[in-house]
Amino acid sequence: MQKVFIALTDHKRLDEFLAKELQISKNQVLNLIKEGLVFCQKKEVKKGGLALKEGDEITLLTPKITPKPLKKELDLEIEVIFEDEDLLVLNKPPNLVVHKALSVKEPTLVDWLEFKNYELSNLGLKERYGIVHRLDKDTSGGIVIAKNNFTHVHLSEQLKTKMMGRYYIALLSTPLKEEKMSVECYLTRNPNNRLKMIALKAVKKEKSRYSKSEFISLLTSQNNLNLIGAKLFTGRTHQIRAHLEYLNRHIIGDNLYGLNGALPKEEIRIMLHAYLIEFKHPRSEQKLRFKVPLLKDMLEYLKKVFDKENLDEVLDEEKILHAFIAK
């Protein structure tokens, strides 16, 4: 597949021209150029600063995804919560990295999407095709995938303007101090452990990023385990886990941010799940909300901790949303 554009005037830079035509940033145009997807007069473009002449034909290729052999463990079933021509909403299982990085050797969610022959947006680097937002490797739950660049741009803008609602469920080893709490701070890499993020209590420092989360208490067990809801206003690396550590609270099963004495004796993954996601459909502008069911392992663990009737009641999506709105 390809798109063709015609330059109507002389001397305009190619990156500026495509940024305007595609409604994306110049950096995103440069990523397309690096991937070898942009041609001018049938010649591959190497630099974004290429000066266009009136009548120049600019071609943008959409790469055809070819299935490739994958490790056996990647040939798994991932629940599709919603799908149309523009996007996917998936229920990501735990122990699956979303996209490749230098430190990532195992197959990723992007590999799985390509294996399943899904059309994906290609504004970012190849290893991030389709990815609008991320979930940590061990976190399960809802993730939105863009099938085309139009969708990617509009969903990214909703994230940037905080119009996309993302709500999580987590199980804490100790109850929150208050029924409703918020953390607003800057996050940066922990100098003592580069795998972790750390909240800065005061001013912004170099290489730190603004972050905000809100937490509500949903249910407390007889042995003081606390089921909570978490709302993201920003989406930084390990944000919920780092913010809870800032409050001296820890998620059951979190081997990175958790306290050793608070971890269960049996092996269990982190009890953190992206439960609700809200956004406006980029094309129809219809408001959409998806409840992403807890996966079996987490649900079974919660049933051991809480009475099923009480658990079902507090997991009602309307009650969770209302609790965040209420003062």
Curated annotation (Swiss-Prot):
<dbReference type="InterPro" id="IPR050188">
    <property type="entry name" value="RluA_PseudoU_synthase"/>
</dbReference>
<dbReference type="Pfam" id="PF01479">
    <property type="entry name" value="S4"/>
</dbReference>
<feature type="domain" description="S4 RNA-binding">
    <location>
        <begin position="12"/>
        <end position="79"/>
    </location>
</feature>
<dbReference type="InterPro" id="IPR036986">
    <property type="entry name" value="S4_RNA-bd_sf"/>
</dbReference>
<feature type="active site">
    <location>
        <position position="136"/>
    </location>
</feature>
<keyword id="KW-0694">RNA-binding</keyword>
<dbReference type="Pfam" id="PF00849">
    <property type="entry name" value="PseudoU_synth_2"/>
</dbReference>
<dbReference type="InterPro" id="IPR002942">
    <property type="entry name" value="S4_RNA-bd"/>
</dbReference>
<comment type="similarity">
    <text>Belongs to the pseudouridine synthase RluA family.</text>
</comment>
<protein>
    <recommendedName>
        <fullName>Uncharacterized RNA pseudouridine synthase HP_0745</fullName>
        <ecNumber>5.4.99.-</ecNumber>
    </recommendedName>
</protein>
<dbReference type="GO" id="GO:0000455">
    <property type="term" value="P:enzyme-directed rRNA pseudouridine synthesis"/>
</dbReference>
<dbReference type="InterPro" id="IPR006224">
    <property type="entry name" value="PsdUridine_synth_RluA-like_CS"/>
</dbReference>
<dbReference type="GO" id="GO:0120159">
    <property type="term" value="F:rRNA pseudouridine synthase activity"/>
</dbReference>
<dbReference type="GO" id="GO:0009982">
    <property type="term" value="F:pseudouridine synthase activity"/>
</dbReference>
<dbReference type="InterPro" id="IPR006225">
    <property type="entry name" value="PsdUridine_synth_RluC/D"/>
</dbReference>
<dbReference type="InterPro" id="IPR020103">
    <property type="entry name" value="PsdUridine_synth_cat_dom_sf"/>
</dbReference>
<dbReference type="GO" id="GO:0003723">
    <property type="term" value="F:RNA binding"/>
</dbReference>
<keyword id="KW-0413">Isomerase</keyword>
<dbReference type="InterPro" id="IPR006145">
    <property type="entry name" value="PsdUridine_synth_RsuA/RluA"/>
</dbReference>
